[in-house]
Amino acid sequence: MLPALKYLGKTVSVTMDRPLGSRHPKYGFVYKANYGFLPGTVSGDGEEIDAYVLNIDRPLQNYTGKCTAVIHRTDDNDDKLIIIPQEDEISDLEIETQTAFQEKWFKHIIIRKIPAIHLICGFIGFGKTTYAKRLEQELPAVRFTHDEIMCARYGRSPEDFPEKYKLIDKEIRRDAAAEISRGHNVILDYGFWSKKKRQAYYRWARQLTPEVCFHVLRCDLNTAKERVLKRNADNLNELFIDENAFNILLQQYEPLSEEENYPAVFISSPPLSD
């Protein structure tokens, strides 16, 4: 996660090295807002985290206020906190307007919330991808579905399945980390059948963001099997799993229980006719 994001919503103290009305030492433009840094912090560029103090119309030396947003420069790995008075609110448009004197030269995005990773958990046929697609629109988020990518790249019944799956998983982890760094929510529609896999993924996800949650799909196994056999015939864009494979894979499935003590929501999958 971007170092600056941990300050979102918190009260911070800023030391101004370029107060309102001062000029940039190299380029000469006038600072139309107070601009400073958080002492003792480290940003993505190795220097102290910078901050704009907005909605204040006088030069400042020091200021304590709330961090309401982060400007993330996508082309130079630099971030700027947006600090305003505790009682104030500010829109993205107002942030853009008040910081344009400097930020107009950089590609950037405004981040308001710490991005989250949502881990979709459940066995084959439990409705994980249907649920993940809905969540993708609601949040919004960037969704990664392992089986979808596998099928598109290698077909419905790929040879050397475990090795290819590991390659896909490595790519997804890389791309998911990049999306989190851009402030985007991420959905991993993977299944997470075993306790060991859940532990490993949870540790990895927590290294990227403190906001990690399992979404646990529950479903009657007969309904799940019926769904899988039906989509084998109806959907050529799904991995092919016959009844024998379903039964064998079921032996590997360890349902997530509340005793595992992960942040989780539990969802009952609707019947097949829904």
Feature map (PLM): residue ranges:
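Hydrophobic N-terminal alpha-helices or hydrophobic patches in metabolic proteins across all domains
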Residues: 1-113
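Conserved substrate/cofactor phosphate-moiety recognition/catalytic segment
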Residues: 126, 130-184
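Pre-Walker A (Motif I) flank of P-loop NTPase domains
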Residues: 114-118, 182-184
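Glycine-rich phosphate-binding loop used to anchor ATP phosphates in small-molecule kinases
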Residues: 163-212
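Conserved GTP-binding G-domain of TRAFAC-class P-loop NTPases and closely related GTPase folds
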Residues: 117, 121, 126, 133-134, ...
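Amphipathic alpha-helical transducer elements in NTP-driven molecular machines
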Residues: 166-169, 173, 218, 243-250
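Conserved phosphate-donor/acceptor-positioning beta-strand/loop module used by diverse small-molecule
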Residues: 208-228
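A structural preference for long, well-packed, hydrophobic secondary-structure segments
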Residues: 120-126, 134-135, 160, 195-199, ...
